[in-house]
Amino acid sequence: MKKDEKNNMDESLEEYDEENYTSELDDLPEYERELILAKRHEEYMKKKHRRMLLKNLHIDEKSKGNIHDDTNKSIETSNKRKGKLNNKKLKLKKKLYESDEEEENDKNDKNDDDQYDNTYQSDEDRKKSNNKKKEQSKKIKGDNESYNIDSISYVKYKKGKIKILEDDDEKNHEDEKKKTDIIDHVSVTDDSYTDSSYKNKKKSKYKKGDTNQTDKTSKKNKNDKTNKTNKTNVSIKTKKHREDYSDDSMDDYHSTSSYEHEKSSDVHYNKKEKKIQLKVISEESHLDNTKNKTGKGLNKILIEKEKKKKKKDLHIVDSVHKNKEDGKNVITDIFEKNEKINKDKELELPQTPERLIHLYKEEKKIKMDIYNYMTYDIITYFQLKKTFLLDMCEHVHFSYHVIGHMIKIIDISKLNKVTNQDVQNTNNKKKIDTANENKKKIFFITNVIKSEPYFSTDRNTNIKFEVAHLENLAHSKFFKKIKNIMYQNKKISMDEIKSNEYYETYICDMNNISDQKFTIDEYNHIKLFSIDLDVLKTFHLFLKEKNEDLKNFRYTEKQLQDLFEKKKQKSFYEIYTNNKSIDNLPITRITVQREICSIQREIDKLNFDKKKTNVNDTYTLSKLNNQINELTKKINILRGNLDKARKNHAAMKSNDQFAQEKNMTKEKSRTNIKSTQKDDATNKFLGVKEMDISYFSKQIYDEKTNFNNMLSSKFINLPLDVHHKVVHHFLLGTIQNNDAVFYDDPSHKIKKELDAEIDKLLGLHGNRHITLFDDIKKNYE
């Protein structure tokens, strides 16, 4: 084995600091930290084990001399024809070897120290050390030049070692150098298992140290096999055994070092030919490799990689900002680029724990890129709307995606088309195609605590959702199906939701919708599909359209209130000054009545203050009197305008009704009736006589009480079964004409009795106890 590797191993083990290794991992999470520390501990134990093995191996200097003698003998036998040349060359070799033996031992230690220091030195110190080495190499090269004789070339290297090369071998040697350089580049990328965020946190010192250690371990793992075979041959006593051992061990070692070269060439050599090809590995090639690993070469590689990554990130950000304006499919571009990079890396690298962490981080980065692209539109949407009610059905046809924890039914025309289609007409392809286009899956939330006219809340999730008004859903079959599912309390699975059936209306709880595919934004409480890119695209388009609509909409609620108040003030000003009528102004009679009430309250307050004031304080009393007089004038003006508006409204109504009656029935006027009676009739019909509001309110109250008393008396007289059935019918609000609901027994006697009772109760026939929606529609049409 080489002395260089031994010294490097010893120094790296002696200067192993736990503080330096753990300080870089403080920012990482526990799981990643433990994995990285475990890997480092394994490397440390391998190095320790290697050092123990190397301590047991003791190769004497005599064995070294015997090795070189054997190589010389093999050269002499192979080159008998060129004996004279070989003798000269061998003499040169011996002289150079003897002269540089002392320099070799000193430089080994220096080079080992330099190699270790390169990993932990700064850039300035490294430049100085490299300049010194170049000067030393120039001196040595000046003394010892390269000799080219015929086909064999003898090269003098730094340490005084000669490399014997033939013409064919020179090319292979150059190829071997190229391969080692390529392997060094690959080793850096293979061992860089962490992602860019982790690399940025690491210091430049520890980068270089880790790359050295990983490259050394890759070489040492190859040499483990040779050490295992040589364990038994450690105790060597005689010279013959030592010679044999030295020959075998060096053959094995050099065969492993030139393993890649043998792999590339298909020629099989004999043992003698192998001895000719034994190449004492030069110090220059070793130093070149170490420079690439630890010196400027590695720094250049790492700097170039970081620059490329920064350029990529900047390119992605620029493309995102550009495509926001252009409206391109940026989400797909980000996803496809990252996916290609991941696939290429997965083919090259094995799936180690560190690699899995790296993949997880990359996936997270993709999702964050997409989400960051969408955040601008999401934030603007919520700033404009300021509510979590998203009308998703307006622009995007989602089958079941609940976004913002809300469900809303809007497209009632489509809903009616779905419900009006019959299930039996599935054979006709045209009808199926039209139904699939108009089809929409509808979901109702059960488990309701409170029910307002348009909103209700879920019991389990406390979600407020909007309900479509039931008067607009004008089909009986639709409500029958809803009632049946309500009785069953059916819980729907994902498979049923995804099924492509023809007739689909469901009721389900929010809890039954699975949240596995959703990612929740904790800041805005939005649920988004992070897997399906189509959903993200459609949601993004929806947000853009909604933002444009909301930006075009100028007024908020406060602004509308301000506008309404301004209109009121202008209209009242015109009434007071120009004596304009209410009908010509944008004000209703209710607003005028409210204004009168508010003015009356102010007058009452002023009168109360007037009573409290002293009689001697004439100034305040005069002020109060003036204010009261002005307000009373305003009230009188408003009341006069109100009376005029009411009379005009009544006259308009009477004229319309009178015209309709004339067209319907044209009766002859009676000549015998007196004119006074005619006037009274016309005045009553036209509503000329003024009636007090209190009189009308009393009349309405009396009618209500009489009706309630009549109903309660009839309900008490009825049997309990009929009572329960009627109440059940009104509470459920079922819309159907089914005898099974009301009549349990098939006997006609009971039917007749019940018909008579219901006729007494409702004043209707037995078959027409409930009016259908179809009848209502006909009446309204």
From Swiss-Prot:
Q: Does the keyword Iron apply?
A: no
Q: Where is this region: Disordered?
A: 1-27, 56-268
Q: Where is the composition biased (Acidic residues)?
A: 11-27, 99-116
Give the compositionally biased regions (Basic residues): 80-94
Locate the compositionally biased regions of type Basic and acidic residues: 57-73, 123-144, 170-188, 216-227, 251-268
Q: Say how it is used.
A: Possible candidate for an effective malaria vaccine as determined by epitope response in sera.
Q: Which positions are tagged coiled coil? A: 616-655
Alphabetical UniProt keywords: Coiled coil, Merozoite
Lineage, top-rank taxon, reads Eukaryota
Kindly indicate whether the keyword Coiled coil belongs to this entry: yes
Please give the name of this protein.
Uncharacterized protein PF3D7_1225600
Q: What is the lineage of its organism?
A: Eukaryota, Sar, Alveolata, Apicomplexa, Aconoidasida
